[in-house]
Amino acid sequence: MKKKGMLNSEISKVLSDLGHTDQIVIADAGLPVPEGVTKIDVALTPGTPSFLDVLKAVKADMVIEGVTLAREIKVDNTENHKQIQEVINDIPITYVTHEQFKALSKQAKAIIRTGEITPYANCILQSGVFF
């Protein structure tokens, strides 16, 4: 049994399989999952686990070179937006419309569905390399 790092075996496998520029999505409970994209559902109850808890856990195990957010988060979910910026630190953020975000999610290797129930609490994480 693993004793540290990502304990969720499905998420751990996806992260291990990522290549440079591959993408995953961390999503709130309501984001639609496109047909053909793997859904890893970790939602337990409304709010559990939170989007930010999952983002922090994934970030600890993943080399991230870019983040994409729906631009609507800047107005409609300012608190989560601020916290996302704090978690990702100096990783570049690209903003797109929510409709563009949903279209981009079709390219993701997986979508991790959280229990988050605040608007636009979704991000696309682009894999980097550690060398």
Curated annotation (Swiss-Prot):
Protein's pathway: Carbohydrate metabolism; D-ribose degradation; D-ribose 5-phosphate from beta-D-ribopyranose: step 1/2
Subcellular localization: Cytoplasm
Binding residues for substrate: 28, 98, 120-122
Keywords, comma-separated and alphabetical: Carbohydrate metabolism, Cytoplasm, Isomerase
GO MF term (any one): D-ribose pyranase activity
InterPro entries (UniProt xref): D-ribose_pyranase, RbsD-like_sf, RbsD_FucU
Gene3D superfamilies the UniProt entry points to: RbsD-like domain (3.40.1650.10)
Taxonomy, superkingdom: Bacteria
Residue positions of the active site: 20 (proton donor)
Catalytic activity: beta-D-ribopyranose = beta-D-ribofuranose
EC number per UniProt: 5.4.99.62
GO cellular component terms, semicolon-separated: cytosol
GO BP of this protein: D-ribose catabolic process
Keyword Isomerase: yes
Main location: cytoplasm
NCBIfam families: PRK11797.1
Summary of subunit composition and partner proteins: Homodecamer.
Function of the protein: Catalyzes the interconversion of beta-pyran and beta-furan forms of D-ribose.
Similarity remark: Belongs to the RbsD / FucU family. RbsD subfamily.
Protein name from the UniProt record: D-ribose pyranase
Biological source species: Oceanobacillus iheyensis (strain DSM 14371 / CIP 107618 / JCM 11309 / KCTC 3954 / HTE831)
